[in-house]
Amino acid sequence: MNLGKVDLINGSITSSMLRFALPLMLGNLLQQCYNIADTLIVGRVLGAEALAAVGSSYALIVFVTSVFIGLSMGCSAVFSMQYGAGDMEGLRQSIFSSVLLVGGVTVLLNVSSLLFLSPIIELLQTPGELQGLVYDYLFIVFLGMIPVCIYNFYAFLLRSVGNSFAPLIFLAISVVLNIVLDVIMMVSFGMGVEGTALATVISQITGSVGLWIYTNRNFPELCLHRKDCVFSGRSLRRITSFSFLTAVQQSVMNFGILMVQGLVNSFGTAVMAAFAAAVKIDSFTYMPVQDFGNAFSTFIAQNFGAGRKERIRNGIRSAVYITTVFSLFVSFLVFCLSPWLMAFFVSPTETEIIEIGVEYLRIEGSFYIGIGFLFLLYGYYRAVALPSMSVVLTVVSLGTRVVLAYVLASIPSVGYTGIWWSVPIGWALADIVGFWYYRTRLKDSSLVG
């Protein structure tokens, strides 16, 4: 059964983008709900130290997974263009080249992460009393990285041809299983952080295998035949050029976050715990504009491949309007509800942690429109075969964030509050650069019509 395929080349622009984006949003919502449930269980059952350990591990996990997610995302841009152009033979050849590239890099990265885990934990300035917990948690999670790669590759493949619903179904299965196993492992068996890591790995294997089987049964046009499995240097170079730059973008983004995590760690367990909870809330609240940016990218790429330039222009206008309205609404909610949101994660008696988290959310949450526009810019440049501009914008955003965070945090009167302020400033500078490039170089060029 072909679940939820959306035609992005014909019909209503706003409706098609929203219908395609909705499963992406729901999928990320499910993932964030799991993250919240996981944080809640760890914080309430295992305590502040375990919460700090798992929370500080999050940045490293995201950094490692961002490499093969970035590779798969870059591949999907090529897939979307070829699908929009009706080149199914070229699409299958690109899929084979992508399997070689993404699979090889994933295995290499997974082995390296396990071998160098201890020095990486020390490099992140993890407090001595937490290093053992962090190592135990990360070692198990990294053992299960390959299933994560498989799921994301097939999810991006299906999304590139307009199906964002099937990945949602298998993600939902994985998330529900993960939460159930979390409770069993930590509450019933008393396994600690190792239990939540093991639950994560088991659920990821289930979701990835399910999506792989579904794709092979329901999308025969995407299945590789012997004639497709022929090495093509041209195809591999094209895939690599897109995927490498997108992976660099994702890696730079998350490496910057990793450096910020190291700075946060230097302020002690209370700030670490507040940051861990606040980041989960933060990512939950701006997640819809991130997913809409990814849907927008697929829309642009398919229409770019099909030569529908006027439709691209109209799509840009619709996307900017939707992002603006949603971002302002969410910023208002987060500013008003941040004390309640923080109290949901930690005990009401942990007043210091709650106050730190509220400060973070009110500073960063007031400027979600900045990250909303940035996600549109990332998606647009990736879709029109300019992934290098996405890298430039990421370097501007994260470079500003990291440098400002370290500079401001070193001022005694500012302290860790400077880390929070560095984020929206980085977003704003990257938005300015991205809009300037579009207005001066691309808006009236033959690239977009």
Functional labels for PLM-detected ranges:
Residues 48-59, 138, 197, 269-284, ...:
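Small-residue hotspots at the loop-to-helix junctions and early N-terminal turns
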Residues 8-46, 59-74, 78, 103-110, ...:
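N-terminal transmembrane alpha-helices
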Residues 19-38, 140, 151, 174, ...:
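Transmembrane helical elements of multi-pass membrane transporters/channels
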Residues 63-66, 178-182, 208-212, 284-287, ...:
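Hydrophobic transmembrane alpha-helices of multi-pass small-molecule transporters
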Residues 51-111, 148-167, 274-338, 371-393:
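Small-residue-rich hydrophobic transmembrane alpha-helices
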Residues 29, 33-52, 121-128, 184-191, ...:
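Helix-terminus/linker motif at the lipid-water interface of multi-pass membrane proteins
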Residues 1-21, 79-146, 188-244, 300-367, ...:
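Short alpha-helical transmembrane segments in multi-pass integral membrane proteins
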Residues 72, 140-159, 167-175, 196-209, ...:
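Short runs within selected transmembrane alpha-helices of multi-pass transporters and secretion channels
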